[in-house]
């Protein structure tokens, strides 16, 4: 199944411990069917210091979350929505909001 989520999309978590949180997609992992969302599914990692590069300690970072647990938030109506595909007049394939019909891809 094709992933309808892209890097930079605003998404909302629909289930799990972070339900209701919104964040920007930092990375998409299509082979694993997961995404990394800013500020969601935070885990603590113990990091060893490397003298020239970084200091050690416990750092908090985002872990991947299954793509089926997030929904794209439409920038026009500000609601979470399913995403559809359609072609514009010039033949370009774009994603659109199935609730309000507005185009999500503005690039």
UniProtKB/Swiss-Prot annotation:
CDD domains documented for this protein: KOW_RPL26 (cd06089)
Cited InterPro entries: KOW, Rib_uL2_dom2, Ribosomal_uL24, Ribosomal_uL24_CS, Ribosomal_uL24_KOW, Translation_prot_SH3-like_sf
Highest taxon above the source species: Bacteria
GO MF annotation list: rRNA binding; structural constituent of ribosome
Annotated Gene Ontology cellular component terms: ribonucleoprotein complex; ribosome
Gene3D superfamilies: 2.30.30.30
GO terms classed as biological process: translation
Recorded coiled-coil stretches: none
One Pfam family it belongs to: ribosomal_L24
Entry keywords, A to Z: Ribonucleoprotein, Ribosomal protein, RNA-binding, rRNA-binding
Subunit structure: Part of the 50S ribosomal subunit.
Protein family per UniProt: Belongs to the universal ribosomal protein uL24 family.
Stated role: One of two assembly initiator proteins, it binds directly to the 5'-end of the 23S rRNA, where it nucleates assembly of the 50S subunit.
The protein, known as: Large ribosomal subunit protein uL24
Species: Thermotoga neapolitana (strain ATCC 49049 / DSM 4359 / NBRC 107923 / NS-E)
Lineage: Bacteria, Thermotogati, Thermotogota, Thermotogae, Thermotogales
